[in-house]
């Protein structure tokens, strides 16, 4: 796994298409200098914003999993961030996953899925369950099912039908 001290972090673009050194908030969260709430605010603002992601987002996935596991933190944000990043990385306006990062990124997604399975007996709200199912679907390459799951609580049956017929 790429070290949080690796100088490449500062060169990776975040969700706003500008360099964002994700190692700084990851390190701060790991050391307890950022609360859960502060950390996830940074993640949702700088690593995933309105379906935009960057290489920093991809590189952060395995690190976030490692930190959450160390802190015994399993919640909506972890699975939703991972599912969201994997889902939108296929969009044309987001950067390709660099070949040098692919194995580490995929291992991070697998680890999040395994971590979720270990927490199956925990109490989950509907949003966490939906996000976990979306993560499994998109990880397995079923973008249509992921999109369908995303429409489930919208109450828009036509959006759900469109989601599965457009893939």
Predicted regions and their residues:
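Intrinsically disordered, low-complexity regions enriched in Ser/Pro/Gly/Gln/His and often acidic
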Residues: 1-2, 117
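Alpha-helical solenoid scaffolds in large eukaryotic transport, assembly, and signaling factors
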Residues: 3-69, 75-104
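General structural signal for secondary-structure boundaries
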Residues: 71, 75, 123-126
């Amino acid at each position: 796994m790429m070290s949080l001290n690796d100088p490449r972090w500062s060169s990776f673009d975040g969700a706003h298409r500008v360099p964002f050194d994700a190692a700084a908030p990851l390190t701060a969260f790991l050391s307890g200098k950022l609360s859960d709430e502060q950390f996830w605010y940074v993640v949702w603002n700088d690593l995933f914003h309105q379906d935009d992601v960057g290489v920093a987002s991809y590189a952060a996935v395995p690190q976030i999993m490692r930190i959450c596991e160390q802190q015994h933190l399993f919640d909506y944000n972890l699975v939703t961030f991972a599912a969201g990043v994997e889902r939108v990385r296929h969009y044309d306006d987001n950067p390709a996953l660099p070949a040098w990062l692919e194995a580490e990124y995929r291992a991070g997604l697998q680890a999040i899925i395994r971590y979720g399975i270990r927490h199956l007996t925990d109490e989950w709200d509907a949003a966490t369950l939906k996000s976990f199912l979306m993560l499994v679907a998109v990880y397995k390459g079923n973008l249509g099912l992921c999109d369908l799951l995303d429409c489930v609580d919208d109450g828009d049956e036509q959006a759900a039908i469109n989601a599965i017929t457009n893939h």
